Amino acid sequence: MFIESFRVESPHVRYGPMEIESEYRYDTTELVHEGKDGASRWVVRPKSVKYNFRTRTAVPKLGVMLVGWGGNNGSTLTAGVIANREGISWATKDKVQQANYYGSLTQASTIRVGSYNGEEIYAPFKSLLPMVNPDDIVFGGWDISNMNLADSMTRAKVLDIDLQKQLRPYMESMVPLPGIYDPDFIAANQGSRANSVIKGTKKEQVEQIIKDIREFKEKNKVDKIVVLWTANTERYSNVCAGLNDTMENLLASVDKNEAEVSPSTLYAIACVMEGVPFINGSPQNTFVPGLIDLAIKNNCLIGGDDFKSGQTKMKSVLVDFLVGAGIKPTSIVSYNHLGNNDGMNLSAPQAFRSKEISKSNVVDDMVSSNAILYEPGEHPDHVVVIKYVPYVGDSKRAMDEYTSEIFMGGKNTIVLHNTCEDSLLAAPIILDLVLLAELSTRIQLKAEGEDKFHSFHPVATILSYLTKAPLVPPGTPVVNALAKQRAMLENIMRACVGLAPENNMILEYK
């Protein structure tokens, strides 16, 4: 059964005029390695910690500024939100299609809230806590091309022509602000697009981005802004002592106009200095140590890296299943070809290397979780190939072969073919990232023994479900298994309204 909304009634939750306050018992374990009489053993001790959560319920008017607004992702997301807001329908070869938010965790998925008369009851994910309605988002952003969003949508060839015709009047006046362009960080083939760029030194470019954010906020009368990078994949930046290893060195490098400070890092610096959440949707190392240091010092949310939309999402599910079933993946070969501008940029070896690292690391935590299958240091052979084939456009083809060892020396091979409509998969993920980032800024918590409420750590692990290479605070384990990531996100939101985590025990029926 499906219900649209619900309210929690419990002595552990209070709905106030401005906040939801909850008291939550976090049950976990602590491990101790004991030595006694010349022998050692591991001891697992159950542990319960009381947390208090406080969530502001006033939903702000949200502005979203996209770096690379005129690209396939930016134009597709903007078009999709307008189509939903205006209730647009259009003819396809199969039917009359209504605008929707399919593919969005927050807008199109559900959570289990309990059972009633022997039937499980589900509610929208977005009903857990007050969230921004995506129809109300005000979009803006930057691009190195001055093409308006209507023409960008036409160039992208993602949406049906009938829909494009209806959306054009809404999008013709949307023109990106000039963007930061550094040909050393992206493929040379992107130079033909770069007709709208911010001139000056790196310090002047940061100052211009800050000015743009302030003017956008004032012009559109928005309460909050989230900035997200959906521009070209950059090459990796060198991380060096004295260059970008600390906050002070990174800011000094900007002042000295050091060539190795990337455009994406400049945008991130501007956002952090302005107190605006910044999310990196590409695989490059935007968040160099000095930038993470800066975000922590300023308590400003940062998240990334790289949208998890198609092939990698499947991989994070399948490898988790195999290892969890006691099956040993020994070879993972992933081949992709695509024909959009992302594919064109990735044809440059340095840009591809960023993507290869992002896509290859996704199985690491699953492999390390099972020492029965894998010796220390052992890892499946893992190869990722991406080729540019202009004809297929945005319809990326992903082919994977998984070879595994099974019972008594047997071999098992799984082969997948996945046609990933690249931008149509990425757009709702971008939507979820900005909505959850905004929500995160309204949640505070404190553990038993702490005097004051505080926000989540600025490095937003809560966004991990949506990214290929989750950014985590120093010393925090990286989790890539998709089911664990979703459970973490859902259970934190449940805790904010005093609900127990969904553990699927269903003891009442046992």
UniProtKB/Swiss-Prot annotation:
Disulfide bridge positions per record: none
Q: Which cofactor does it need?
A: NAD(+)
Q: Where are the transmembrane segments?
A: none
Pfam families noted in UniProt = Inos-1-P_synth (PF01658), NAD_binding_5 (PF07994)
What is the E.C. number? 5.5.1.4
Subcellular localization is given as: Cytoplasm, Cytosol; Nucleus
Which keywords belong to this entry?
Cytoplasm, Inositol biosynthesis, Isomerase, Lipid biosynthesis, Lipid metabolism, NAD, Nucleus, Phospholipid biosynthesis, Phospholipid metabolism
Pathway field: Polyol metabolism; myo-inositol biosynthesis; myo-inositol from D-glucose 6-phosphate: step 1/2
Please verify whether the record's keywords include Isomerase.
Answer: yes
GO MF entries: inositol-3-phosphate synthase activity
Record has Transmembrane helix as a keyword: no
What family does the Swiss-Prot or TrEMBL record give for this protein? Belongs to the myo-inositol 1-phosphate synthase family.
Function summary: Key enzyme in myo-inositol biosynthesis pathway that catalyzes the conversion of glucose 6-phosphate to 1-myo-inositol 1-phosphate in a NAD-dependent manner.
What is this protein's name?
Inositol-3-phosphate synthase
List the source organism: Zea mays (Maize)
The taxonomy runs: Eukaryota, Viridiplantae, Streptophyta, Embryophyta, Tracheophyta
